[in-house]
Structure formats: C-alpha cells, structure tokens
Amino acid sequence: MTDSTPAKPKQHRTVFFVSDGTAITAETLGHSLLSQFPQVEFDMRILPYVDNEASAFDAVGIINQAAHDDDLRPLVFDTLVDPAVRDIINTASACNLDVFEGILSKVSAELGVPAEPIVGSSHGMVDSQDYKSRIDAVHFALDNDDGARTRQYDMADIILIGVSRSGKTPTCIYMALQFGIRAANYPITEDDLDDNRLPKVLKEYRHKLFGLMIDPERLVAIRNERKAGSRYASFQQCQMELRAIQGIYISEGIPSLNISEMSIEEIATRVIQTKGLKRRIG
C-alpha cells in the first residue's frame, strides 16, 4: 500500500534584512542560514538605510505589521552599527538576530584592540573603488541579461548559458553585487536545441561559457509559476530541453553545474571556483 498521508504544508515566516547601508551583508548571511531550512517558506524583505532613529521607528512599524498579519514573529537579520538605532529595532515584535553580535567582541579580544564600527562600512561602501566596481558590474549584468547585448561579450568575465528559467539571471546579479564580476547570460532556445549546437554568437566566447543544469521536476515547478499549464511548463518539454542542452555541454566541452538543490550563494561560489574568476571586491 502507498502512504496516502497528505504532505505537511510548509511553515511560512516573514524575514527582514535591516541595515544602515545597502543590506547586502545582512541579506547574504541571512540567505546562507535560511537555506538550511528548506521545509520553511520565507517571505524576504529588505529594509536598507536604517541609519537614524526616525527610520528605525518606521522599520519597527513595518516589522510589527508583518507580525500582526502573520500572527507570527518575523525573523530580523541586522547589521546595524549605531546602538541607539539597534535598540529601537530590538523593540519590534520579532526574533532579532544581530549578524555581528558576539563576533566583534571575539575579534576585538583576539586582536587586543577595540572595534570602531563605521556606519555602512560592512557593505564595502567606504571604498570608492569597490563601490564603482560593484555598480559597473551590476549595470553590465542588467545590460547583458537574457542575451540582450551580445556585442559586449568581449568585456564579460563569464557568460552563463542554460534553458529558460534555470537560474542564470539571479546568479549573474549576485556575482555582480557581491564580487564585482561582469557576468552576462544567454538563453539557449528551442531553436538552438533543434540545431544541437551552440548559437553562432557564442562560439568565439566558448572559453567564457558556463552551463547551468536543473532537474526537470524543479524546472516544471518554476515555469508553472510563470505560465501555468502551458507546453512551455510541461514535464515533456522541460525534459526534452534539458537532455538536449546537456548534449551540447558535453559535445562543446562546456563545464556545467546542476543547481537544483543549491542556493544562489553556492552556485556563484562554484562558478567562480570552477572558472578561476577574479573577484574585484569581497
């Protein structure tokens, strides 16, 4: 007999990333921790530039509203430096998680000098060159998303390829934001797969290519969020595309990675490591 017990519904929890800067650090560390709990569905929200008491009180109002709406305490990851601002955030009806709590004191004790926190410094914004590298990389990723501008590929550090909805765009944006890497991406379409070879525009950049793979069941779920019940989202279509693109990766000697059970952070790290990419920041 088969087990007819219905699957237990996922727990839902709202999460806030609160920062006196861009919230990139809080979000990155928070994502890494939350990825360990796949049985929970997280609604993630960013509250950046909470750098004074007025904005802190506004943030508390938003957090408390979420607690009321969900009838559950949200999780709050923060990288706040100003004690007065942090104290206000800690009054919210939430599980407050100071990302740096306990870490700075241990580092200070080891180094024998006190920490001198600077608002925004945890996000790399105090270094103008890092800031410029980050912004330039993000602009590049956006301009070269989804095969939009192939003429800039000579400037790319990496070109991610894969079927539609296989994680190319978020990975490119993440690498740009976190590491200043100029990442482009190109979707391999059904027409390309029918030809069973790389699109002509990619051939001269083969050394920059990295392929993303995904399990067909996962791809079906993602595509159904966009076009439910369509041929595009059918298992047969997804399986056909993935088998075809795997053949291209093998025949063209393109390194690839199955990202089905991986977080964006893990995908980016593996891509960087495999291709030996140089991080401009971080």
Named regions from a protein language model:
Residues 183-194:
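Short beta-strand-centered segment that lines the nucleotide-binding/catalytic pocket of NTP-utilizing
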Residues 125, 205-241:
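A glycine- and Lys/Arg-enriched "phosphate-lid" helix/loop adjacent to the NTP-binding pocket
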Residues 96-146:
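Hydrophobic alpha-helical segments and helix pairs
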Residues 19-21, 49-50, 78-82, 261:
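Structural motif
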Residues 248-282:
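NTP-dependent small-molecule kinase module
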Residues 45-66, 74-79:
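Metallocofactor- and cofactor-centric catalytic cores in central/energy metabolism, strongly enriched
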Residues 135-182:
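Internal active-site segments that recognize and position negatively charged phosphoryl groups
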Residues 1-33:
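N-terminal accessory targeting/assembly segments
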